[in-house]
Each structure stands twice: as structure tokens, then as C-alpha cells.
Amino acid sequence: RTIYENREENGLVIVARTDARTVVGLDEAIRRGNLYLGAGADVIFVESPESYEEVCRIAKEINGPVLFNNVEGGRSPFLSREQLIDAGVKLTIYPNAQTRVVTKKCTELLETLKMTGSTGQMADQMLSHKELWAMFDHEKWVAIENKYIVR
């Protein structure tokens, strides 16, 4: 209730999740999603629809924005952007996609290091230091550090 009452001033979006699809069925998941909207949720996340048709039904029958969890190799179908738009899905997440890619690449790097004693063979697959620092706005953080550092 506190989050709901104070969300306007900080731009918070409340996403309500239901796992009812897996346990008690799609009808109950949709019913709960609509109840969550009535209680103040902004977006509804029905976990584990089992087909594209179910995703379409969820987006049609829930009376507000729907989030879809797009996971490669998950229980739900992996859908294209066009399918999601056509279904009426308003927000899509890709949980663990980056982590899975990065972990695979890190494993390759460590295997290369173990086998050859060097990571140099993979230098062409790495960001330059300049590119890396730009991603993290390094200069901004150095300026903050310099402002507060005791010398």
C-alpha cells in the first residue's frame, strides 16, 4: 500500500506477477491479473503461458498492460518482436540472456588462458579500455571521486 500511495512522486511502475497459470490454470491467472490491476498494479506478468495463443489471450483479457518473460529454452514459447506486438504485449523482459552469453564468453576466455597461458588470442573480441570506460561514464566517477577524496 505504501508503494502504491507514493509511486506518483517517484515514477515507480508496479509490476504484479502471478504464477497461477502453472498451478491452477490460465483462467485463474487472468482473473488474478485483473484483480491486481484493481488493487493498483500498473503492469501484469503472467508467468509461464504455454503457447502463443495463451499469450494473445492474456494480453486481450487482462484490462491493462501485460509483461512477457521471453526466455530462450523456457517453458513459454520464445517469441519474436512482431509476435509480441501482434499479441498486444506492452513490455518484454529477457532475463538471464546477457548473463548466459557473458558466462559462455568468460568460460571461453578462461579455457584459453588455461590452455595457452594467455588471453591475447581473444583481444579482438574485447572492448578497448576506452570503450569500457565510456560505458560506465568513467570521467564522471573520477570527477566525483576527486571532489570528495582526502588528499
What are the roles of these predicted feature ranges?
Residues 1-94, 100-107, 111-112, 141, ...:
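Alpha/beta enzyme core
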Residues 113-151:
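Flexible C-terminal active-site loop/helix
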